[in-house]
Amino acid sequence: MDIQRTQSLLLLLLLTLLGLGLVQPSYGQDRMYQRFLRQHVDPEGTGGSDNYCNVMMQRRRMTSTQCKRFNTFIHEDIWNIRSICDTANIPCKNGNMNCHEGIVRVTDCRETGSSVPHNCRYRARASTRRVVIACEGTPEVPVHFDR
């Protein structure tokens, strides 16, 4: 009986791992997912200060050719962020129906207006608020920060 149970569990594990390997995001979706992670996810960060925004925007390569005017960093575990993709679909700003909403801890970084590329300056605002992200793929992963 114990051997059968062990074999059944091993078979279930093998099938699960195979299934996960078969449903990886496409190359394009994976690139968009990696870009989303680079631009918007900082699970370890506390954020909230102007210096945080100045450093992170430069570190994440959003200030080299021009100063990105606005960006949001999400301070949640990636699995919490990915779980937003499991919520009901809502319209995105562009009209597509692949957006989802959730409440997360964020730091919004807004460019001050007196910035120049390579020396961009930001004002920070930390909050817990509703965000909307676009998700794609099977399984769905976040690919765009909508609002």
Swiss-Prot record:
Entry-linked Gene3D superfamilies: Ribonuclease A-like domain (3.10.130.10)
Subcellular location: Secreted
SMART domains assigned: RNAse_Pc
A Pfam family reported for this protein in Swiss-Prot or TrEMBL: RnaseA
GO cellular component terms given for this protein: extracellular region; extracellular space
SUPFAM superfamilies linked to this entry: RNase A-like (SSF54076)
PROSITE patterns noted in UniProt: RNASE_PANCREATIC
Keyword vocabulary terms for this entry: Antibiotic, Antimicrobial, Disulfide bond, Endonuclease, Hydrolase, Nuclease, Pyrrolidone carboxylic acid, Secreted, Signal
Positions of disulphide bridges: C53-C109, C67-C120, C85-C135, C92-C99
Active site per UniProt: H40, H144
EC number, as in UniProt: 3.1.27.-
Signal peptide range in chain numbering: 1-28
GO BP annotations listed: antibacterial humoral response; cellular response to starvation; defense response to Gram-positive bacterium
Main location: secreted
One GO molecular-function entry: RNA nuclease activity
UniProt entry tagged with the keyword Ribonucleoprotein: no
Modified residue annotations for Pyrrolidone carboxylic acid: Q29
InterPro entries: RNaseA, RNaseA-like_dom_sf, RNaseA_AS, RNaseA_domain
Signal among keywords: yes
Binding site for dUMP: R35, H40, K68, N71, T72, F145
Domain of life assignment: Eukaryota
Function according to Swiss-Prot or TrEMBL: Cleaves preferentially after uridine bases. Has antimicrobial activity against uropathogenic E.coli (UPEC). Probably contributes to urinary tract sterility.
Family the entry assigns: Belongs to the pancreatic ribonuclease family.
Entries under PANTHER family matching the protein: RIBONUCLEASE, RIBONUCLEASE 4
Listed name of the protein: Ribonuclease 4
Organism, as annotated: Rattus norvegicus (Rat)
Gene name of the encoded protein: Rnase4
